[in-house]
Design a protein with these regions (language model features):
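A short, hydrophobic secondary-structure junction motif
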Residues: 122-126, 189-194
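Flexible, glycine/charged-enriched surface loops at secondary-structure junctions
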Residues: 177-181, 190-205
Length: 288
């Protein structure tokens, strides 16, 4: 599910939300579709030119992430210039060059407005394999973060649901491929419980050899769906069994507590009356 404009409209796109920047690096997008399209267009153009001029040099995943962030910053700078400096007859260049003749308060105010200029929210996972191995980066309005050590990343409104599945499975970067495939699919399906997450699922695989990018087709996705549903049924059955065990256990505790209370009541009746607090305790004990 992608978001358009001010976030008031959400829609399921007819195109995949992942895009192969190279045959070894893929971008997965979440958030505002307009800003994502604008960034992606420029990033893809730069990468294509890089491949054309240096066809034998593999692009690093980190370089792709830095490029994505750099393009976003340029777009933000240009929009801020048009919205804030444009009405004043200024550009970034003339604003910087003319600061000596401007009041300090004016410069500080404009600088603050430029730095805090609002942009649409977006998140992008850039993942792939380069000559240094496999990598996972997340680029957003707030910078670049590397998730190589963690071994997984999730973005969008369903990210917490997906992350919880990876955490519960104790997933790491050394996990086997067969474990990761089903876990990834199941995490996506569980994330559909979150508002704004659509049912459409796109999957791909990169590696183990650099330059190998494979789109997971519909037949495989259908098989994964069957496996996921069987897993869900097993989990639901296990939960029902556990609830039944807890019910029987608490019932047993209640019965034992009732017997104990009845026994205490009987001893009180046999003894005549229950002693009050402090009763039978002498304030003047005699020496024997």
């Amino acid at each position: 599910m992608l978001t358009s404009g001010d976030g008031a409209v959400e829609f399921e796109p007819a195109f995949p939300k992942s895009f192969a920047l190279t045959n070894s690096i893929v971008a997965m997008m979440a958030g505002d579709s307009a800003i994502q399209a604008e960034i992606l267009q420029d990033v893809h153009g730069v990468i294509l030119e890089r491949i054309r001029t240096h066809p034998t040099v593999w692009i690093k995943v980190k370089e792709a992430a830095e490029l994505y962030s750099k393009v976003y910053s340029k777009i933000k700078q240009k929009r801020g210039e048009n919205a804030i400096l444009g009405p004043l007859g200024l550009t970034h260049k003339t604003f910087i060059e003319g600061q000596k003749s401007m009041s300090e308060s004016f410069v500080n105010q404009i600088t603050k407005e430029l730095l805090n200029f609002g942009m649409e929210e977006f998140e992008t996972i850039l993942t792939g394999i380069d000559t240094d191995g496999a990598h996972i980066y997340v680029v957003s309005n707030y910078g670049i973060h590397c998730f190589d050590t963690v071994g997984f990343a999730a973005i969008g409104s369903g990210s917490r649901h997906a992350q919880s599945q990876f955490m519960l499975a104790r997933h790491g970067r050394l996990a086997k491929q067969e474990e990761t495939i089903l876990l990834t699919y199941s995490s996506k399906k569980y994330s559909e419980a979150a508002p704004g997450v659509g049912e459409a699922t796109d999957m791909f695989s990169i590696g183990p050899v650099i330059g190998s990018h494979f789109i997971v087709g519909e037949p495989i996705l259908k098989d994964l769906e069957k496996m996921h549903r069987r897993r869900v049924k097993r989990e639901e059955a296990a939960l029902r069994k556990s609830v039944k065990e807890v019910h029987e256990y608490t019932k047993k505790l209640q019965e034992e507590a009732a017997k104990l209370a009845k026994g205490q009541q009987a001893s009180v009746i046999d003894g005549g009356s229950a002693p009050t607090d402090g009763a039978g305790v002498s304030n003047n004990p005699k020496k024997g």
